[in-house]
Amino acid sequence: QGDNIQYEATITASNPIGLLYGAYELIRLQNTDAYNTGSGNQQNFSKAIDETEKPQVGLRILNHWDNLDGSIERGYAGKSIFKWEEIKLGKKGKGGSISKSLHDRLITYARANASLGINGSVLNNVNASPKMMTAEYINKVKVIANILRPYGIRVYLSINFASPMALGYTKTADPLDKKVQQWWQKKAKEIYATIPDFGGFLVKANSEGQPGPGDYHRTHADGANMLADAVKPYGGIIMWRSFVYGANHKGEDRVKQAVSEFKDMDGKFRDNVILQSKNGPLDFQPREPYAPIFDNIKKTPQIAELQITQEYLGQSKHLTYLAPMWKEFFGFVNPSKLVGISGVANIGDDANWCGHPFSQANWYAFGRLAWNPSLSAEEIAHEWLVQTYENQDEKFTKPVEMMMMTSREACVNYMMPL
């Protein structure tokens, strides 16, 4: 309302979650004063606010490297927000109650993600504990899923490939073993009976000591397809990480090994298997080229894995704004060729969520770029600044935006070469 004229905004969408996204977009426009024409003219106002939004990729997922004991691998913002001990199950392990503090924290988490269009969350570390597949944790995951669902967020779980053997149900984890296949089929049935909209599994296999099909002279396709068959009846997906080195190609340049490992399997995966690959071929370095696997895999759907947490970029001690780095990546890898974008989360139970006051900007930037990779790093920095600090004075925004925009290059200059 301005100049005694009241305006109305209409939000339409194809589903209820779309309406929620639209409401958050309107709030963003208001908070950033994006439609201020300076004239009070209704025609100009209507033109400014008339827009249609559609996400570039379907899967926009946070990957939490959170362990069941509350620790976080590469976490720099306290302990995990998923306080499993604060979820109490009812009789026979069903039902469940949750502490008010955890419930409130998860609601805030869900709202923050929904405001960015993030629609998935992998709750646990890719270096996964087999305990994640027990009935106790599956029922606790249900409690979290029920909280996130109204905000359009589906839950996923990382799995330990050797779970049936580690939990004592089979003598092997060979993906071609009938008993192993049956165990995963029953486990998938159990999970989907508990959480009908469960998203699927994220898998780190035969990488950095994790078990996998290679332990039994089987291929990644053998392992992924076995799991894919188990979740297929329920609409689930398998996100199989290509971060594999030192298994079958020892001595070869590490940056080539993902292609060497997976290229010959391209086209041999089930249609609900997606290869998830880090943006660079080495390991989330401050500057490295885009991973060649994005050029070499033609028939298998792919997800790009970005790292929001600053493992090699100052952890949560340094201001390092990562949107320029991700824009550099998308300048080489066309997002239209991807089915999803995942981000290794930088979230913890610190009061400010991300450790460093400016690290929230990277969570925000990930969500905005996953929704619309054509946004500029400058636009996103400005959006985050004026919404976070509620200050649109250019005497504040201009120097701080410049500090953000130059921070990644500064980090490269003092972190590189390796």
Which stretches of residues belong to each language-model region?
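Active-site-proximal beta-alpha loop/turn segments in soluble metabolic enzymes
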Residues: 165-174, 204-215, 243-253
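Short acidic, gly/pro-rich beta-turn/loop elements at beta-sheet edges
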Residues: 21, 72-74, 133, 165-167, ...
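Feature activates predominantly on carbohydrate-active enzymes
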Residues: 2-185, 189, 193-202, 232
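Short small/polar-residue motifs
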Residues: 1-2, 352
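Hydrophobic faces of well-ordered beta-strands that scaffold small-molecule active sites
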Residues: 60-64, 110, 121-123, 155-159, ...
